[in-house]
C-alpha cells in the first residue's frame, strides 16, 4: 500500500547577501515538520531553494565585476553550506536560473497571455529595488512632498527608498478572481494560518480592491524573458511563485512528481510575504486550473530588543557562530522552543544560554547521566526488563507518557513547536521528580526491594526513550547519542509508532559503562558576552585594523610562482578527515590531483565544474596519505574561505600573470 504523501515548502531565498538566523528559522521549522511527518510514515517531499532573478542581482553582480551566474554560484554555495550545517533534510533545492524552472515560467506566462488573463499596458508606480515591489502612494512610509505632490518615500516592508518608475508592462488581471478567492477562503477556513493573517489579507488588500498586477519589466534583463516579446522579463510574482510546481516537473516530459505530490500540504514563510502566497499564488493557480495548496503558514519575525535585525545596528545573529560554538542541537532547540511559531519572538543571548544550560544540560542531560549511572551502580550496567507498573507512581508515569504523546501530536499538527517542546520538558521534569519520589538509593539498601528498584530503572529508561523519540524532529544528534548510551539499537524502538504502548523494553539490555555528557554546561557570563560580541557591526573603514603586510618581494621572486587556470573535474572527501577534499583538475595538457583543506566550506558537488587558479610548480606533498600536486588559490576573510573563481572563457592551462 502506497504511503500518504506530504509536500512542504519554504520560501525561496533571495541570495543578495549572507543569510542570517531569520532565514535559518524558516528552514529549520520546515525541516522539523518534514522529519516529524516522515516519522509518522508519510512519503515526504521537502523543497527549498533560491530566487535568483531581478534587478538587485544584476546590480550586485556588476558591482562585483562578475557575471550574474558567477555571482550567484558563490552565494548559493554559501546557502547550501549553511543548510548542510543545519542538517536540513530537504529532498530538492530549486534554483530559478535552472532550465527546468525557466521552461515552466515561459509556458505559464504564454498560456495566461493566450487565455486573456495577462494583457499589455503601461505601469507607473513607486518601486523599491531591494524588495522588487511596487507600492501605491498611500502605502509609502515617510512620504516626501514638494508643492503638495509626493516626490519620494520608503518601502513599508523594508524601509528602503523608492523611485518613481514608468514603463511598458504586462498585467495579470487578478481582480476578476476576487469573488472566487473569497469563496475559497470561506470553504477552506484554515487555509491561511495563523487566523490573524487571513483577516489582514481580507481587510487590508482584498476588500479595498485588488489592482491588476504588473508581471513584467523592461528596465533590466536578468531573468526569464517573455518568449513572444523578449524585451520583457517575467517579474517575480510569476517567476518565483511557480517554483513550487516547476520543482515537481509540471509541464515537463515527466510529471510524475507533480501528479504525486501536488497540491502542497504546507507553504511555509515569514509574514512579510504571506500576501503573495495567499492572494497572488492562489489566483495564479486558479487561472491555470490547478488545485490550490492546503495551507499557507506565515510565521513571525525574530526580533532583537531594539527591533528588527540590521547589520548597521549590530544585532544580526549568524547561525554559523552559534552552531560552531554550541552545537547544532542547542541552536535548533532554541529556535523552536523560545520563539512561539506564528508570532514575533525576541532573540537574546541570555535566553539562548539559559535554554542550553537549564533545559538541555540540566533537565535532559542530567536525567540521562543519573539514570545510566544508577543502572551501572545497582545492576552492573544490565537494565532489568520492564515488568509493568508496580506502584501508583509507575502508573502515573505511564499515563503521563501516553498523554504527552497525545498533546505533543496535537501541537505538532498545528505547528505549535514551542508548545510541543514544552510538553516534552514537562514530562522530562516529572521524570526527574520520579527519581526523587522513588528514592532508588534507599531501595538499593534493601534486597527485598530489588524488583522494585529494577522496575524504577526500567521506567526511567522507558521515559527517556519516549523523550528521545519525540525530540527526533528537533534535535539531530542528542536522540542518537541517548539511544547509543542506553544501547537501544532496535530501529523500531526509535520510531513514533513505538510510543503507542508503554513498556517495549521487555528484555534486559546492557547500557554504556560510563555515561558521556550530551550537553556540557556553559559558563553563562562568558558565553553571553561572546554572543553579544559576535553580533557587533563590522568596523568602519576608519576603525578597521590594518592587516599586517608580508615583506616586499622582487618581481623575480614572484615570477618563480607558476599559476594556471584549471577546471575541477572531480572531487571527493578524504577518508578520516573533515577538512580535506581530494580534487582532480584539468590543466589542458595534463590532469592533476590536489588535496585542499576546503571541506568545511564546500562539498564535492559544489566545486565540480568550477574554473579555478592553481599553483602548478609547488613540490608534491602527501596529506593524509594522498598525493597533492599543486595548490588551488582561495581567499579568506573572518574565518570564511572562498575559492578564487575564474571566468569560464579563460582556457585551461592559461598562465595567470
From Swiss-Prot:
It is an enzyme of class 6 (ligase). ATP binds at residue 311. A motif ('HIGH' region) lies at residues 13-23. A motif ('KMSKS' region) lies at residues 308-312. Its EC number is 6.1.1.10. GO terms for biological process: methionyl-tRNA aminoacylation. It comes from the Bacteria. Pfam families: Anticodon_1, tRNA-synt_1g, tRNA_bind. One of its GO terms (molecular function) is tRNA binding. It is found in: Cytoplasm. One of its GO terms (cellular component) is cytoplasm. Is required not only for elongation of protein synthesis but also for the initiation of all mRNA translation through initiator tRNA(fMet) aminoacylation. Homodimer. Belongs to the class-I aminoacyl-tRNA synthetase family. MetG type 2B subfamily. This is Methionine--tRNA ligase.
Amino acid at each position: 500500500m502506497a504511503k500518504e504523501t506530504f509536500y512542504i515548502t519554504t520560501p525561496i531565498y533571495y541570495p543578495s547577501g549572507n543569510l542570517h538566523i531569520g532565514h535559518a528559522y524558516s528552514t529549520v521549522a520546515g525541516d522539523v515538520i518534514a522529519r516529524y511527518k516522515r516519522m509518522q510514515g508519510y512519503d515526504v517531499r521537502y523543497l527549498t531553494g533560491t530566487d535568483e532573478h531581478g534587478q538587485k542581482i544584476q546590480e550586485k553582480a556588476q558591482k562585483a565585476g562578475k557575471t550574474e551566474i558567477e555571482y550567484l554560484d558563490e552565494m548559493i554555495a554559501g546557502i547550501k553550506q549553511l543548510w548542510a550545517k543545519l542538517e536540513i533534510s530537504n529532498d530538492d533545492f530549486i534554483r530559478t536560473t535552472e532550465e527546468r524552472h525557466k521552461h515552466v515560467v515561459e509556458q505559464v506566462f504564454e498560456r495566461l497571455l493566450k487565455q486573456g488573463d495577462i494583457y499589455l499596458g503601461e505601469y507607473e508606480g513607486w518601486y523599491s529595488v531591494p524588495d522588487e515591489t511596487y507600492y501605491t502612494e498611500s502605502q509609502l512610509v515617510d512620504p516626501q512632498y514638494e508643492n503638495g505632490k509626493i516626490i519620494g518615500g520608503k518601502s513599508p516592508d523594508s524601509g528602503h527608498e523608492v523611485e518613481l518608475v514608468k514603463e511598458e508592462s504586462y498585467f495579470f488581471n487578478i481582480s476578476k478572481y476576487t469573488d472566487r478567492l473569497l469563496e475559497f477562503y470561506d470553504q477552506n477556513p484554515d487555509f491561511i494560518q495563523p487566523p490573524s493573517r487571513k483577516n489582514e489579507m481580507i481587510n487590508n488588500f482584498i476588500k479595498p480592491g485588488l489592482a491588476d498586477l504588473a508581471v513584467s519589466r523592461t528596465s533590466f534583463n536578468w531573468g526569464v524573458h517573455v518568449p513572444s516579446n523578449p524585451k520583457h522579463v517575467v517579474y517575480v510574482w510569476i517567476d518565483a511563485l511557480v517554483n513550487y510546481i516547476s520543482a515537481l516537473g509540471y509541464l515537463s516530459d515527466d510529471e510524475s512528481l507533480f501528479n504525486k505530490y501536488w497540491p502542497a500540504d504546507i507553504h511555509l514563510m515569514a509574514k512579510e510575504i504571506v500576501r503573495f502566497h495567499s492572494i497572488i499564488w492562489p489566483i495564479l493557480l486558479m487561472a491555470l486550473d490547478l488545485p490550490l495548496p492546503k495551507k499557507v503558514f506565515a510565521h513571525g519575525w525574530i526580533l532583537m530588543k531594539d527591533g528588527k535585525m540590521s547589520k548597521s545596528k549590530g544585532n544580526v545573529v549568524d547561525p554559523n557562530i552559534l552552531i560552531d560554538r554550541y552545537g547544532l542541537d542547542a541552536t535548533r532547540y532554541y529556535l523552536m522552543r523560545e520563539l512561539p511559531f506564528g508570532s514575533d519572538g525576541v532573540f537574546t543571548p541570555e535566553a539562548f544560554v539559559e535554554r542550553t544550560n537549564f533545559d538541555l544540560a540540566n533537565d535532559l542531560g542530567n536525567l540521562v547521566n543519573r539514570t545510566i549511572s544508577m543502572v551501572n551502580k545497582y545492576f552492573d550496567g544490565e537494565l532489568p526488563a520492564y515488568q509493568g507498573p508496580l506502584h501508583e507512581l509507575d502508573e502515573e508515569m505511564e499515563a503521563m507518557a501516553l498523554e504527552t504523546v497525545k498533546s505533543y501530536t496535537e501541537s505538532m499538527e498545528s505547528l505549535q513547536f514551542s508548545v510541543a517542546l514544552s510538553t516534552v520538558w514537562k514530562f522530562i521534569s516529572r521524570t526527574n521528580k520520579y527519581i526523587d519520589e522513588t528514592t532508588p538509593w534507599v531501595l538499593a539498601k534493601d534486597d527485598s526491594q530489588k524488583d522494585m528498584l529494577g522496575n524504577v530503572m526500567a521506567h526511567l529508561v522507558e521515559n527517556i526513550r519516549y523523550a528521545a523519540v519525540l525530540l527526533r524532529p528537533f534535535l539531530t544528534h542528542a536522540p542518537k547519542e541517548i539511544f547509543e548510551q542506553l544501547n537501544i539499537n532496535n530501529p523500531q524502538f526509535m520510531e513514533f509508532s513505538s510510543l503507542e504502548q508503554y513498556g517495549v523494553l521487555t528484555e534486559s539490555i546492557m547500557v554504556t559503562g560510563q555515561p558521556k555528557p550530551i550537553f556540557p554546561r556553559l559558563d553563562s557570563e562568558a558565553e553571553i558576552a561572546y554572543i553579544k560580541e559576535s553580533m557587533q557591526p563590522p568596523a568602519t573603514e576608519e576603525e578597521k585594523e590594518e592587516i599586517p603586510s608580508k615583506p616586499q618581494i622582487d618581481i623575480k621572486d614572484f615570477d618563480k610562482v607558476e599559476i594556471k587556470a584549471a577546471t575541477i573535474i572531480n572531487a571527493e572527501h578524504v577518508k578520516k578527515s573533515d577538512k580535506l577534499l581530494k580534487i582532480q583538475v584539468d590543466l589542458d595538457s595534463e590532469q592533476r590531483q590536489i588535496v585542499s583543506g576546503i571541506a568545511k566550506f564546500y562539498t564535492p558537488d559544489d566545486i565540480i565544474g568550477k574554473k579555478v587558479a592553481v599553483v602548478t610548480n609547488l613540490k608534491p606533498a602527501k596529506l593524509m596519505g594522498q598525493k597533492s600536486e599543486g595548490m588551488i588559490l582561495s581567499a579568506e576573510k573572518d574565518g570564511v574561505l572562498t575559492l578564487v573563481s575564474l571566468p569560464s572563457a579563460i582556457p585551461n592551462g592559461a598562465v595567470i600573470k
